[in-house]
A protein has these predicted regions:
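Small-residue-biased structural context
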Residues: 1-145
Length: 145
C-alpha cells in the first residue's frame, strides 16, 4: 500500500504513529529472541508514560473533536485507547501482555492512519488543523511528547 499523504498540520501527530509501530517491531523482535518479558514490559511502560499518554491526549482533545463524540470512528478509537492502557499497566502475565500490546497497538495505529486520520483530513477546517498542530507543539515544547 502506498504511503498516505497527510496534511502538513497533521504530519507531526501522524509521525508519532511510526514510533508506536517501531515499539511493536521491537516487541516482536524481543519475543522472537526470547528476551526477558519483564524488561520488555518496563520498556513498554516507559514508552506509554513518555509518548503514548500525550499522544492519546492530543488525539482526544484536538483530533477526535473534528468528527464529534458520536462518530463511530471516534467511538472505536476511544475504546481502542482504553485497551492498550490496561495492557501497558498490567504485569500479571508479561509475555501474553507483550504479544497483545504488539498486535492491538499495531492494528489500532493502522486503523487511525488508514481510516480515522484520513476522514479527519477530509472534513477538518484549517482552524481545526491549526489547533491540532498548536496543541502538539505545546506538548512537544514541554518535552511531554
Amino acid at each position: 500500500m502506498p504511503p498516505l499523504e497527510r496534511h502538513t498540520l497533521l504530519k507531526p501527530v501522524s509521525r508519532e504513529h511510526h514510533e508506536g509501530l517501531m515499539l511493536c517491531w521491537h516487541i516482536r523482535k524481543a519475543l522472537a529472541q526470547g528476551l526477558d518479558p519483564n524488561v520488555q514490559m518496563r520498556a513498554c511502560a516507559d514508552f506509554y508514560h513518555t509518548h503514548l499518554l500525550s499522544h492519546f491526549a492530543i488525539e482526544e482533545e484536538a483530533v477526535f473533536p473534528v468528527l464529534g463524540a458520536v462518530d463511530p470512528l471516534v467511538k472505536r478509537a476511544l475504546a481502542e485507547h482504553r485497551r492498550p492502557t490496561r495492557l501497558f499497566l498490567a504485569w500479571e502475565d508479561p509475555l501474553s501482555n507483550l504479544s497483545l500490546i504488539e498486535e492491538e497497538l499495531k492494528a489500532h495505529i493502522r486503523f487511525e492512519e488508514r481510516v480515522l486520520f484520513q476522514r479527519v483530513q477530509e472534513v477538518a477546517t484549517e482552524e481545526q488543523l491549526e489547533r491540532i498542530d498548536r496543541l502538539h507543539g505545546l506538548l512537544a515544547s514541554s518535552h511531554v511528547v
